[in-house]
Amino acid sequence: MEVKVFDNDVEKALKILKNKLSKSGLFKELKVRRAYEKPSVKRKRKAIEARRRFAKVQRRRSS
């Protein structure tokens, strides 16, 4: 991932980098990988996430 710094504006470049990293899901993955997650817990978490995504799509379609 690459972010260019213009006019020595490091703050803006850092903000852009953080935005790109969050959109790519890197922060979320790092949070998950901090500690070992049992397979059963992982399956449960993924199922909950899938339900949330599905509900979100349904809300958008009904609006």
Swiss-Prot record:
GO terms for biological process: translation. Gene3D superfamilies: Ribosomal protein S8. It comes from Syntrophus aciditrophicus (strain SB). PANTHER family: MITOCHONDRIAL 28S RIBOSOMAL PROTEIN S21, SMALL RIBOSOMAL SUBUNIT PROTEIN BS21M. GO terms for cellular component: ribonucleoprotein complex; ribosome. The gene is rpsU. GO terms for molecular function: structural constituent of ribosome. Keywords: Ribonucleoprotein, Ribosomal protein. It comes from the Bacteria. Belongs to the bacterial ribosomal protein bS21 family. InterPro entries: Ribosomal_bS21 (IPR001911), Ribosomal_bS21_sf (IPR038380). This is Small ribosomal subunit protein bS21. HAMAP family: Ribosomal_bS21.
